[in-house]
Amino acid sequence: MRDHTKLKAFKLADEMAVLIYEITKSFPKNEIYGLTSQMRRSVVSVPSNIVEGCARESQSEYLRFLEIAFGSLRELHYQFTLASRLGYVEKSRISECETKITETEKVLSTLIRSLRKY
């Protein structure tokens, strides 16, 4: 079994989850079951799928869960962009979040590509 806590992709995804939860606290109340909920589900899905993949025995299952995590990450990226365009994200936090999301995408996609070679 792989140790997810040693993966940079997991660490970044975990930090990103905390960041998105903090940011969505200030979203309009009418979005609690809309964009707020969607973003929170997406962001929690990323590290959760990394953890689940690490618990799988086969390399192919591990890779499949990392790919699911990446899909959730791309979904979150769009949702964050939409929330920013709607004015829900404080301007001072946009760059910080954008950087964290993009960095996580790069690290996770690199991990996925390296596993596909084997």
What annotation goes with each model-predicted range?
Residues M1-Y118:
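Short, C-terminally biased terminal segments at protein or domain edges
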